[in-house]
Amino acid sequence: MFNTNDFIFTSETTPDVTTDLTACVQQVEDLISVADAVNVTDSPNCKSRLNSLLVASEIKRSGLDVILQLTGRDRNQIALESVLLGALSVGINKVLCLSGDQPDENGPAVVNEFNGNGLIELCKVIAGGTLSDGTAIKNPLPIYPGAADDLYTQISKPDALDKLVTKIEQGASFVQTQYCFDYDVIKQYSEKLNTQGSFENCKVIIGMGPLKSAKQGDWMRKNLWGVNISDAILKRLEDSGSPAETGEAICQELIEKIMDLPCIDGVHLMGPSC
């Protein structure tokens, strides 16, 4: 995925609350010959699900490359290092490093020993052949950490780019962004990234997905961090006799428009479940 100049397509899956591992793998079977990789999420919304590394391992065995999402919310250093060693042992070497969704006030306890930046640094330590305490790793393997980003924050806050560049300098090999449905915003983001040489060796993948209705889009822009959907898009969906088909068309049109933008290397297609 990182050794190509081709436009990258990634997608994602969220393990279910189940003991049926086969069913989790079957959810992504249609992506095997289409996507470059699939993200496996790590207990999003702070809700317990089937272990993400177990699901990711089975998906990897099916022939589809995997990006393991890993949060610092639930695990201390020992647990995180164990997960990273486990991932490498089954051939998973791409890890999207996240702080993780935080629980409600009366929700489960969290650890938060590592945020996204700290996880990127931890990955680079592991890739260097040791644990954090200096213990040598037998049969060390390369690992490619990734960072998350929000386009709207980038184009509205002058210091946001410095924070992203810091993640690249720490060792992030790729960036996956939150949903964006606005070409002008992606273009501004592209132009801002292009002012920095830091992204020459980092793949930037824009998050998007087909909206099914205006109601869904309105909910997303009101409730999801970093998501801004224009009134024009919502009106187009609302006026459509087939809003799901219109949502797919909007997504496809946007992909075609951004493919030649500098510093934009692919799209991360997500299926909104709201």
Name each model-derived stretch.
Residues 1-37:
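Conserved N-terminal beta1-alpha1 strand-loop-helix module at the mouth
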Residues 7-22, 66-78, 143-159, 237-249:
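Active-site mouth loops of central-metabolism enzymes
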Residues 9-15, 36-40, 66-70, 95-97, ...:
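Hydrophobic faces of well-ordered beta-strands that scaffold small-molecule active sites
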Residues 13-17, 42-46, 72-74, 99-103, ...:
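Active-site-proximal loop/turn and secondary-structure-junction residues that shape catalytic pockets
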Residues 17-31, 51-52, 77-84, 156-166, ...:
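Short, acidic/polar
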Residues 20-22, 46-58, 76-82, 102-135, ...:
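Active-site-adjacent beta->alpha loops and helix N-cap segments on the catalytic face
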Residues 33, 90, 170, 261-262:
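Structural motif
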Residues 114-139, 148-153, 197-254, 273:
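Active-site pocket-lining/capping segments in soluble small-molecule metabolic enzymes
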